Amino acid sequence: MAGSVIQGENYRISVLTESLVRLEYSEGGVFEDGQTQVVQNRDFGPVACEVVETEEVLDLHTEHLHLHFEKGPFTPDRLFIELKGQYAVYGSRWHYGDQPETLKGTSRTLDEVDGAMELEDGILSKAGYALLDDSSSYLYDVESGFRARPCPEVDLYFFGYGRDYLGALKDFYHLTGQPPLLPRYALGNWWSRYWPYTSQEYTDLMDRFKAEGVPLAVSVIDMDWHKTAIPARFGSGWTGYSWNRDLIPDPAAFLHG
């Protein structure tokens, strides 16, 4: 693992880039270098880093960050990281245990969602810093697959990129692996119209696309295929698995159309 690594009996601090630092604390003194469910590649190459260390205190400087650690368990009064730049009214200093307010991330699924939903935290923030907590993820290798960590540990990644959001995303993907490309079939023509089609109207529409020589990769029948005027106790009417037989009297024949 390239970059600067400072390790004690129960802690390890790895400077991955001038703006990205890994913080580990393990009561058993066991640290992980392998892949996890989230992290695949921690090798970013050499990093310019200045370390000032005594038996009690560690100060670490990169071009963009200053880390101060009074050796011992990670606590708010012992460990902080400060960005070298004014990104918030009262400065951009993170103390261990603080939960940064981020610009949020994404949702993995819409299962059981009926209305607004809370997004997970992301790695971008108006304050200039954010956290990725990898402490609870499983370890992974090709031969044995997923397995639990042999020793519980704090395993955090501090992203201190200021307003360099593209840089943060670039290094995030370097750390976690590139997302898969969209499948080729998803890049074709999609047809989706919010309209109460009958099964005959929709079949006629598909026949017209074929007659006009317009290929379709995906065809969406939107939401009127199911009942929408339903009792409130069943939900909002925006979802469901009923069939509106006034519009689609023979669902099986329609689907096999």
Description of each model-found segment:
Residues 16-55:
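A low-complexity, Ser/Thr/Gly/Pro-enriched, surface-exposed linker/loop concept
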Residues 180-257:
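Aromatic-lined carbohydrate-binding/catalytic grooves of carbohydrate-active enzymes
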Residues 52-184, 193-194, 199-200, 206-211:
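Catalytic and substrate-binding clefts that recognize carbohydrates or anionic sugar/phosphate headgroups
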